[in-house]
Design a protein with these regions (language model features):
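N-terminal signal-anchor/first transmembrane alpha helix
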Residues: 3-144, 178, 182, 193-229, ...
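A structural signal for multi-pass alpha-helical bundles of membrane permease subunits
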Residues: 115-421
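Intrinsic disorder/low-complexity segments
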Residues: 1-4, 320
Length: 421
């Protein structure tokens, strides 16, 4: 039985003490940022030799205790608040501060410490961007998922893992997960096989190779929103090019919720229902547009991999009497495995985050939510319903699914990758 969002009770075993929970309802983000920035600058001061290790950690621990005191008993709130007002200055300081310090003070360090110091100084800009735009949003999304209906307009109550329990009982979440699964299964292998076939054809002694390569790559550099808008007209039931080409006037590609397996087997008297019916015709239309859009990128990458294979291998295979298919099965596919593994990994990760083409082609998620994906459902919960806590829970589950599947496919497929030519 689904759990209503309005009937949720906070579980005491999952929540902090009452006094801390009451304070966390108005817990400002700049307190978290302030503690983190103080920790970073304290560690840098310790690495530069300005502070001993115990002093740097002591200052950070003291500030943390001070912030908790202000959180629980209301005192000294001006200290973290003042630090929070300086938050806009933290990104440029974090980016330029270490580099400037390295130029000014780096040569004063001992010779052995200079190499490590300059290494950290050069790595820090990229590391700072990674922490600010990747690591921190991920951690903050998990933090938001522990509250009840965060919308940044009113205080939110701490809910522990309640959002995740509701998520597991949400039929729309499972519908979105199933649709996303179909999208991954159809688009990733199909796109990779088509791209490999086209790349092999272009790798032969064909005239105007540069022109063909440009033509295949043009869809990828076209804005995805614009491309999806064009395809929406291609799928139009009355004026669409596809219906004219197939002589199927009136077929509404983007509003047909019937599964393609059910449509194909219905003339044979076989009726399929539910998940066995397959993805809807509308979702297959979305997937076809996606394969077309990303095909050029995969073709260019695969063509570069094919051109790196020595021609002597094919010449030796011809002398041994190998056929066209034997050459590509025994030479091309094994030596192209690093490239295909790379594209398969990127395709798997990207397919689980599909949003733009689904939103443009089917803005409502389909007639029966048959084109609803995880990213689309996350968007609806966060920006349409203003429930950022539940949207954050969806984001964290999506992140875990992508992480697990990526690790599994890496473990299964990397053993078959041949990095030696």
């Amino acid at each position: 039985m689904a759990v209503s969002r309005t009937s949720v009770h906070i579980l005491p075993i999952l929540g902090p003490p009452a006094i801390l929970r009451q304070g966390m309802r108005t817990y400002p983000l700049h307190w978290v940022l302030g503690v983190g920035v103080l920790l970073v600058f304290g560690l840098y001061a310790q690495r530069l030799g300005f502070l001993p290790a115990w002093a740097a950690w002591g200052l950070w621990a003291g500030y943390l205790l001070l912030a908790l005191w202000g959180l629980l008993w209301g005192g000294w709130r001006a200290v973290p608040l003042a630090l929070g007002l300086l938050a806009p200055l933290f990104p440029p300081l974090a980016f330029l501060g270490p580099l400037g310090t390295a130029l000014v003070l780096g040569r004063t360090l001992p010779e052995k410490a200079q190499a490590a110091f300059y290494g950290w100084a050069l790595v820090w800009p990229a590391l700072a961007l990674l922490l600010v735009w990747q690591v921190f949003p991920t951690l903050y999304a998990f933090y938001l998922s522990l509250f009840d209906r965060v919308n940044f307009l009113r205080p939110a109550a701490f809910a522990g893992l309640q959002n995740y329990r509701i998520l597991l009982e949400d039929p729309l979440f499972w519908r979105a997960l199933g649709n996303t699964f179909w999208y991954v299964v159809f688009t990733v292998p199909t796109g990779l096989l088509l791209a490999t076939f086209v790349a092999i054809l272009l790798n032969t002694q064909v005239a105007f190779l540069g022109l063909y390569r440009t033509l295949f790559f043009l869809p990828y550099i076209t804005a995805l929103t614009a491309a999806a808008a064009v395809w929406r007209w291609i799928y139009h039931p009355e004026f669409g090019f596809l219906n004219w080409l197939l002589h199927t006037p009136g077929l509404d590609w983007l509003n047909t919720p019937t599964g393609v397996f059910a449509l194909l087997l219905r003339p044979l008297g076989v009726e399929l229902q539910g998940f066995l019916a397959g993805p809807s015709l509308a979702f297959v239309a979305v997937m076809a547009m996606s394969v077309w859009h990303f095909l050029g990128y995969q073709v260019v990458i695969l063509l570069a991999g094919l051109q790196a294979i020595p021609k002597e291998y094919y010449e030796a295979a011809e002398l041994d009497g190998a056929s066209f298919f034997q050459k590509h099965r025994l030479i091309t596919w094994p030596l192209l495995s690093p490239t295909t593994f790379f594209l398969f990994t990127l395709g798997l990760i990207g397919a689980f985050q599909v949003f733009t083409q689904v939103y443009v082609l089917t803005p409502t998620g389909g007639v029966l939510q048959d084109t609803l994906t995880l990213a689309f459902y996350l968007y609806n919960k966060g920006f349409r319903d203003s429930d950022f806590s539940y949207a954050s829970a969806i984001a964290m589950v999506t992140f875990l699914v992508i992480l697990v599947l990526t690790l599994v496919q890496r473990r299964l497929l990397e053993k078959r990758v041949n990095y030696e030519i």
